[in-house]
């Protein structure tokens, strides 16, 4: 996967939003984006979606812009209001505090992008 650190930052950012707002569609997106033990996403399509987003932006190391492009591409499949609002907020540079927190977490290995199976 291209720019795995950027992917982890974007995942953590979305996870922070989900933890504050608990949108169903965002939970589904995060579930598919969660990483398996081998480092690949639970839904293999997200690896190519992320790689395509990274290829489309001018600076492949700019994970914020890659996240914006990822959401644009995701919404081309079908518009989902909750995801569209996150995209609008990113384009307007809102919630940068959450983005910066996500960057810090990933840089210090405080994130957990791995899929967990829980049995009760």
What residue spans do the PLM features occupy?
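Polybasic, proline/glycine-rich intrinsically disordered low-complexity segments
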Residues: 34-60
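Residue-level detector of well-ordered alpha-helical segments, enriched
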Residues: 5-9, 25, 46-49, 62-66, ...
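Amphipathic alpha-helical binding modules
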Residues: 73-120
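Amphipathic alpha-helical segments that form the core helices of the histone-fold
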Residues: 28-40, 84-95
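Short terminal alpha-helical segments
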Residues: 1-35, 67
